[in-house]
Design a protein with these regions (language model features):
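All-alpha prenyltransferase/terpene-synthase fold signal
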Residues: 1-219
Length: 219
């Protein structure tokens, strides 16, 4: 219950950061009640997730792992907005690991927080890192596929959010073209009247980036 509360708090805050109006087909908290309420709700859910652990004596030893996960998640989310250039594949993997792995690994790693330096723990950590990247790649492919179905640029491209397919496409661009993916100083999306958006969406669809990403997921 504690981890699920933390997970949902991260989704509420994520929608605020990304200006998303819906979550899983349902109007997001920030869209329905405003950004301020959404931030406060997310904060309250994080506090409640810690409170649940502190009230159960059998789980109090997991509080350190729980709080470390919160710190890592916050740093990972902030890292997404701290660069003006679109992430390379290596940077993409690092971003995903920072904002996804701590949450996915928490239920198991929190069971034995004193044994994090063992060989077995490192193997478990690598497993969760790989799982996090695979999970995010699935979401990214779905985002591109949704754009194709709607015959419109995918939201991840429009908002210049890290996406596995776009990162692979970006890696293959000449340095001069990569500059066209440079974000504004606010780290935000393409302007609504920016003609590059449709152009680059067409180029992504014409490339083999989506096929390469699907193969990566299969591997």
């Amino acid at each position: 219950a504690s981890v699920e509360l933390l997970h949902n708090a991260s989704l509420v805050h994520d929608d605020v950061c990304d200006d998303d109006s819906d979550r899983r087909g349902i109007t997001s908290v920030s869209e329905m009640y405003g950004r301020e309420i959404a931030i406060c709700l997310g904060d309250a859910m994080i506090a409640l997730s810690s409170l649940l652990l502190s009230q159960d004596t059998a789980l109090q030893h997991t509080l350190t792992a729980h709080n470390l996960a919160i710190l890592k998640l916050s740093a990972g989310q902030a890292a997404e907005f701290s660069t003006l250039s679109y992430p390379t594949w290596a940077a993409y993997e690092k971003l995903v690991e920072g904002k996804t792995t701590p949450l996915i690994s928490l239920p198991l790693l929190g069971l034995n927080p004193s044994d994090q330096d063992s060989a077995e723990s490192h193997q478990v950590a690598q497993y969760f890192s790989d799982t996090s990247i695979a999970f995010q790649i699935m979401n990214d492919i779905q985002n591109i596929d949704q754009g194709k179905q709607l015959a419109a640029p995918a939201s991840d491209l429009r908002e210049l959010r890290p996406n596995a397919v776009i990162a692979i496409f970006y890696e293959g661009l000449p340095d001069l073209d990569k500059r066209l993916f440079t974000r504004s100083k606010s780290g935000k999306k393409f302007a609504e009247n920016d003609t590059r958006l449709n152009f680059w969406w067409e180029q992504i669809l014409l490339s083999d980036s989506l096929a390469i990403t699907r193969r990566l997921l299969g591997d």
